[in-house]
């Protein structure tokens, strides 16, 4: 018959009359002063097992007694001194979860704010001034206004109007105006001391975006059945056309005979 080898490590003497109590249903409750009182409400306190320094002979029964004693302790009923509240969960969350910083490569240079772009609303329109002149792409980077009819009506450009961030206002809607199918956007810059309208080439991977640079932003203002486009970079300067035929579209300050009122014709995507 196989024999159980003797344990080689030091172990306290549990071979006493009280050891048998651990094998009873309510054994540990009958023992007094054997274990330290503990409170689960305090994370720094716990059950402590003290090992005696006495050197005695060990047996398999002593090892089993220790194991059974620990198992019995797990089953001891404990009355909690407080009612568990939601805020108590924060104590455990700090051990379970680890905070990590949120990193983003894009920061707003003006306001030093974190910018997270999302898909923006975009509609397509044809624009005509109040004299019904259409806007066409004359040179690679120049728009002109002229009357079209017949087959050449398809020469007029289609604008991709993106609704972007801008100054809060009840009667002004900030938009960016790009040419559909081309990487060109209308922008306003200062040239020779005068606010100037131009077509600017952009990276299609970066544009359009919700937070457009201010030179690209126009405040769309509805006046009865017409619309005006005021430069956000240069207030009181508007996208304008001349009374004359076949003249470039420019940025004007609503003086003289400049035309700043347009009609919009919606185009399906």
Swiss-Prot record:
- Name what induces it: By LPS.
Q: Which Pfam families does the annotation name?
A: IL1, IL1_propep
Q: Which domain of life is it from?
A: Eukaryota
Propeptide residues per the UniProt entry: 1-117
Protein localization: Cytoplasm, Cytosol; Secreted; Lysosome; Secreted, Extracellular exosome
- Report one GO cellular component: vesicle
Q: Which GO terms describe its biological process?
A: astrocyte activation; cellular response to interleukin-17; cellular response to mechanical stimulus; cellular response to xenobiotic stimulus; defense response to Gram-positive bacterium; ectopic germ cell programmed cell death; extrinsic apoptotic signaling pathway in absence of ligand; fever generation
The answer, when asked if Transmembrane helix is one of the entry's keywords, is: no
User: GO molecular function: any one?
Assistant: integrin binding
Q: Which Gene3D superfamilies match?
A: 2.80.10.50
**Tissue expression from the record:** Expressed in activated macrophages (at protein level).
Q: Which UniProt keywords apply?
A: Cytokine, Cytoplasm, Inflammatory response, Lysosome, Mitogen, Pyrogen, Secreted
Instruction: Note the site residues: Important for interaction with integrin.
Output: 172, 180, 182, 191, 205
- Provide the family line: Belongs to the IL-1 family.
Cite the record's note on assembly.
Monomer. Interacts with MEFV. Interacts with integrins ITGAV:ITGBV and ITGA5:ITGB1; integrin-binding is required for IL1B signaling. Interacts with cargo receptor TMED10; the interaction is direct and is required for the secretion of IL1B mature form. Interacts with HSP90AB1; the interaction facilitates cargo translocation into the ERGIC. Interacts with HSP90B1; the interaction facilitates cargo translocation into the ERGIC.
* The protein's role, per its UniProt record: Potent pro-inflammatory cytokine. Initially discovered as the major endogenous pyrogen, induces prostaglandin synthesis, neutrophil influx and activation, T-cell activation and cytokine production, B-cell activation and antibody production, and fibroblast proliferation and collagen production. Promotes Th17 differentiation of T-cells. Synergizes with IL12/interleukin-12 to induce IFNG synthesis from T-helper 1 (Th1) cells. Plays a role in angiogenesis by inducing VEGF production synergistically with TNF and IL6.
Mention any additional remark: IL1B production occurs in 2 steps, each being controlled by different stimuli. First, inflammatory signals, such as LPS, stimulate the synthesis and promote the accumulation of cytosolic stores of pro-IL1B (priming). Then additional signals are required for inflammasome assembly, leading to CASP1 activation, pro-IL1B processing and eventually secretion of the active cytokine. IL1B processing and secretion are temporarily associated.
What name has this protein been given in UniProt? Interleukin-1 beta
Recall the taxonomic lineage recorded for the source organism: Eukaryota, Metazoa, Chordata, Craniata, Vertebrata
The gene from which this protein is expressed is Il1b
């Amino acid at each position: 018959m196989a024999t159980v080898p003797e344990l080689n490590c030091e172990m306290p003497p549990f071979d006493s009359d009280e050891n048998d109590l651990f094998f009873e249903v309510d054994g540990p409750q009958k023992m007094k002063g054997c274990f330290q009182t503990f409170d689960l409400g305090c994370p720094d306190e716990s059950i402590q097992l003290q090992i005696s320094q006495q050197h005695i002979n060990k047996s398999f029964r002593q090892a089993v007694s220790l194991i059974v004693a620990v198992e019995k302790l797990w089953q001891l009923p404990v009355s909690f001194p407080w009612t568990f509240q939601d805020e108590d969960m924060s104590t455990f969350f700090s051990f379970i979860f680890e905070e990590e910083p949120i990193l983003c490569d894009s920061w707003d240079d003006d306001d030093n704010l974190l910018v997270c772009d999302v898909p923006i609303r975009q509609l397509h329109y044809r624009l005509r001034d109040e004299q019904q002149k259409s806007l066409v792409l004359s040179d690679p980077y120049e728009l002109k206004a002229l009357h079209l009819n017949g087959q050449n009506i398809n020469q007029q450009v289609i604008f991709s109007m993106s609704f972007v961030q801008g100054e809060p206002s009840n009667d002004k809607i900030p938009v960016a105006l790009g040419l559909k199918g081309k990487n060109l956007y209308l922008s306003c810059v200062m040239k020779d001391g005068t606010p100037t309208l131009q077509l600017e080439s952009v990276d299609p991977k970066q544009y359009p975006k919700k937070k457009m640079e201010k030179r690209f932003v126009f405040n769309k203002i509805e006046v009865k059945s017409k619309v005006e486009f005021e430069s956000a970079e240069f207030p009181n300067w508007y996208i304008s056309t001349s009374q004359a035929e076949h003249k470039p579209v420019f940025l004007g300050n609503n003086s003289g005979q400049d035309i700043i009122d347009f009609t919009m014709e919606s185009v399906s995507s």
